[in-house]
């Protein structure tokens, strides 16, 4: 049986390249989400534009899993780099995903852990391996590691320092991956996060997030398309 791949991006810019590659796509619009159900390079794909933030991502991921039944999920798009080895346009691949803005430590949970859930959501090892292989083949610099999510665009030294204190090995931050991972965990669907860096903490730049975003979308989409060929 041929596999079907779910792909999730938050913003129109993050899914546009992939959407333009799709054929035989039908569009599902529901609850502020858009799902494009079709094919890319003869691989069955369901592409979700979820909207920004963890609630939108959770709604969209649930709809994607229930309505299109993908065998696995790839979360793509942009992220802010916190690992010193990451620069704009580089690729970050999840080895674990956590909420950085959840705190139930008063009841004995780890920082970022929600009750009835693991402290960290672990991606599928095969998907991580495929992502790393295709990133290397494409010649991109890549870091694999912890990706932390929260409903905040992280900038400013104080916020960055707090996240690093709570999660010393954090590689990148963004606003949806932990919600997507939590829904995939609940539905027992394998996932991986493959994003490109749009802005880098602690490094001065005259370029804004908006100027970085097209490059991040291009690079992350290139890796996702290469990954799809492994499941055709």
Curated annotation (Swiss-Prot):
One Gene Ontology cellular component: cytosol
Reactions listed under catalytic activity: S-adenosyl-L-homocysteine + H2O = S-(5-deoxy-D-ribos-5-yl)-L-homocysteine + adenine; S-methyl-5'-thioadenosine + H2O = 5-(methylsulfanyl)-D-ribose + adenine; 5'-deoxyadenosine + H2O = 5-deoxy-D-ribose + adenine
Keywords associated with the record: Amino-acid biosynthesis, Hydrolase, Methionine biosynthesis
GO biological process: L-methionine salvage from methylthioadenosine; L-methionine salvage from S-adenosylmethionine; nucleoside catabolic process
E.C. number: 3.2.2.9
Name of this protein: 5'-methylthioadenosine/S-adenosylhomocysteine nucleosidase
Enzyme class name: hydrolase
A molecular function (GO) term: methylthioadenosine nucleosidase activity
Top-level taxon of the source organism: Bacteria
Active site: 14, 199
Gene: mtnN
UniProt family annotation: Belongs to the PNP/UDP phosphorylase family. MtnN subfamily.
Pathway the protein acts in: Amino-acid biosynthesis; L-methionine biosynthesis via salvage pathway; S-methyl-5-thio-alpha-D-ribose 1-phosphate from S-methyl-5'-thioadenosine (hydrolase route): step 1/2
Cited InterPro entries: MTA_SAH_Nsdase (IPR010049), Nucleoside_phosphorylase_d (IPR000845), Nucleoside_phosphorylase_sf (IPR035994)
């Amino acid at each position: 049986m041929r596999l079907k791949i779910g792909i999730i991006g938050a913003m129109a810019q993050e899914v546009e390249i992939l959407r333009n590659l799709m054929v035989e796509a039908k569009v599902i619009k529901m609850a502020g989400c858009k799902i494009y159900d079709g094919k890319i390079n003869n691989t069955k794909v369901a592409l979700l534009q979820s909207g920004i933030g963890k609630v939108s991502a959770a709604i969209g991921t649930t709809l994607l899993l229930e309505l299109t039944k993908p065998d696995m999920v790839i979360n793509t798009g942009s992220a802010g780099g916190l690992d010193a080895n990451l620069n704009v346009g580089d690729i970050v691949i999840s080895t674990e995903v956590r909420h950085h803005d959840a705190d139930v430590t008063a009841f004995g949970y780890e920082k970022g852990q929600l009750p009835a859930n693991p402290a960290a959501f672990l991606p599928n090892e095969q998907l991580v391996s495929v992502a790393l292989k295709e990133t290397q083949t494409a010649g991109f610099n890549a870091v694999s590691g912890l990706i932390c999510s929260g409903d905040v665009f992280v900038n400013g030294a104080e916020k960055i320092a707090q996240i690093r204190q709570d999660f010393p090995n954090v590689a990148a931050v963004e606003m949806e991956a932990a919600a997507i991972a939590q829904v995939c965990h609940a539905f027992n669907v394998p996932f991986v996060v493959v994003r490109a860096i749009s802005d880098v903490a602690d490094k001065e730049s005259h370029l804004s997030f908006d100027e970085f975003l097209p490059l991040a979308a291009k690079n992350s989409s290139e890796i996702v398309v290469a990954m799809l060929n492994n499941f055709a």
